[in-house]
UniProtKB/Swiss-Prot annotation:
<keyword id="KW-0455">Luminescence</keyword>
<comment type="similarity">
    <text>Belongs to the GFP family.</text>
</comment>
<feature type="modified residue" description="2,3-didehydrotyrosine">
    <location>
        <position position="64"/>
    </location>
</feature>
<dbReference type="GO" id="GO:0008218">
    <property type="term" value="P:bioluminescence"/>
</dbReference>
<feature type="cross-link" description="5-imidazolinone (Ala-Gly)">
    <location>
        <begin position="63"/>
        <end position="65"/>
    </location>
</feature>
<keyword id="KW-0157">Chromophore</keyword>
<protein>
    <recommendedName>
        <fullName>GFP-like non-fluorescent chromoprotein</fullName>
    </recommendedName>
</protein>
<keyword id="KW-0599">Photoprotein</keyword>
<comment type="function">
    <text>Non-fluorescent pigment protein that is mauve in color. The wild-type form is non-fluorescent.</text>
</comment>
<dbReference type="Pfam" id="PF01353">
    <property type="entry name" value="GFP"/>
</dbReference>
<comment type="subunit">
    <text>Homotetramer.</text>
</comment>
<dbReference type="InterPro" id="IPR011584">
    <property type="entry name" value="GFP-related"/>
</dbReference>
<dbReference type="InterPro" id="IPR009017">
    <property type="entry name" value="GFP"/>
</dbReference>
């Protein structure tokens, strides 16, 4: 791990899928520091622009899907960095409280100083009059994922809040499974939390988007009762 990942790494992302039957493709590039847990991405829609839905539902598949860029504190073993050079995959189902569902599969590999992400998504049942299809969302609130091991893989559970103009936030529930492609056993982390913040500093005409994410893995800050 130490010799493969540097303090500055490049990112390339290739995404395709459908949302409510509408097909699209995106490509992007970026950079970040895996050990500080910060990253930037620049993503362009290459097929299907302008998108007829809010890109916000895809941004967690990009930044929040870029699991190598997490600052692990308190000696928490880093499952994702240990997985190189082979890499890892993840699957995620996001269930929105208005009925929308987004499923995603991502493959992470390493080529030189560049992390390669290949993502496939399927979005269904987003209401025509909802904030996603009306494109009135305004980014994500910060959130926290709970992470735990389960028979050699990592599971993640998270509740995210999508900001909506003039309305309460749209809540969604995320269920993620992370799988290393490395054949040998890894040092598994115990139950912990991963705090994350996704921002979109810039976008153009629903066809170009810039993302920033910061993420920190930690144990609970609440002390146990002394015995």
């Amino acid at each position: 791990m130490a010799g493969l990942l540097k303090e500055s790494m490049r990112i390339k992302i290739y995404m395709e899928g459908t949302v409510n039957g509408y097909h699209f493709k995106c490509e992007g590039e970026g950079d970040g520091n895996p050990f500080e847990g910060t990253q930037n991405m620049r993503i362009r829609v290459t097929e299907g622009a302008p998108l007829p839905f809010a890109f916000d539902i895809l941004s967690p598949c990009c930044a929040y899907g870029s699991k190598t860029f997490i600052k692990h504190t308190s000696g928490i073993p880093d499952y994702f960095k240990q997985s190189f050079p082979e890499g890892f995959t993840w699957e995620r189902t996001t269930i929105y409280e208005d009925g929308g569902v987004l499923t995603a599969h991502q493959d992470t590999s390493l080529e030189g100083n560049c992390l390669i992400y290949k993502v496939k998504v399927l979005g269904t049942n987003f209401p025509a009059d909802g904030p996603v299809m009306k494109k009135i969302s305004g980014g994500w609130e910060p959130c926290t994922e709970i992470v735990y091991q389960d028979n050699g893989v990592l599971r993640g559970r998270n509740v995210m809040a999508l900001k909506v103009s003039g309305r309460p936030p749209l809540i969604c529930h995320l269920h993620s499974t992370y799988r290393s492609k490395k054949a040998c056993a890894l040092t598994m982390p115990g139950f912990h939390f991963a705090d994350l913040r996704i921002q979109m500093p810039k976008k153009k005409k629903d066809e170009y988007f810039e993302l920033y994410e910061a993420s920190v893995a930690r144990y609970s800050d609440v002390p146990e009762k002394a015995t």
